[in-house]
Amino acid sequence: MAAFDRILSGIPEMDQALDNIRLGDNVVWRVSHLQEFRYFCEPYVEQAIKDRRNIIYFRFASHEPLVKECPEVKRIEIPLSHQFENFTVEIQKVIEREGFDAFYVFDCLSELQTAWATDLMMGNFFRVTCPFLFSLDTVAFFPIIRGKHSFHAVKKILNTTQLLLDVYSDPNNIYVRPAKVWNRDSETMFLPHIYKKEMGTFR
């Protein structure tokens, strides 16, 4: 496939509202808790399986897995050591090996702050990894936890990623507010949206 080709997220109305996720996109989901990320990660993985994509899940955090074990998804366990360089190099080796057009899910980046005792290193990891993924026309989903990081760390991510989507939820609705959508043309992409998972609507 060609760079910046549209892909399917598994939520058709979200594709329409955001003018699609594209090859090369790093998609950061800023959430209050990881269940909010799962609302969007699960259909993304299910769609990628249907589309016979090369799907890789980077597993390094202590939280519950974000992707269920299945033969269609490669689960890569990367020990989350205190060494920024070692961890980053191991991730990049896998990305290089998997090559073009791969689809990724990363564990929560907020856990990097705990391991490295600073969230600026989390921002540095993203700033190094994101352009490499972009150069290989991949798609990658990353969750971060809202309110856990400094302005400077979040700014590094915001300046580097192609999409940053804020997700909020209550017992009745899931709300999405795009904070950054790069190189799209849609009248609705910066509007707040309500996602009703059971109905599949995103309006």
Listing of model-derived features with the role each one plays in the protein:
Residues 24, 52-53, 137-138, 159-163:
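Short glycine-/polar-rich loops that comprise or flank the Walker A/P-loop
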Residues 145-203:
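Phosphate-binding/switch region of NTP-binding enzymes
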Residues 115-116, 121-148:
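Substrate-engagement module of ASCE P-loop NTPases
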Residues 51-114:
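Conserved inter-motif catalytic segment of the P-loop NTP-binding fold
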Residues 2-62:
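Glycine-rich P-loop/Walker A and Walker A-like loops and their local beta1-loop-alpha1 context
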Residues 29, 57, 105-106, 138-146:
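Structural recognition of the conserved hydrophobic beta-strand(s) that form the central parallel beta-sheet
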Residues 34-35, 61-65, 81, 109-111, ...:
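Conserved nucleotide-binding/hydrolysis micro-motifs of P-loop NTPases
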Residues 27, 56-58, 74-76, 141, ...:
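Hydrophobic/aromatic beta-strand patches that form the interior of the parallel beta-sheet core
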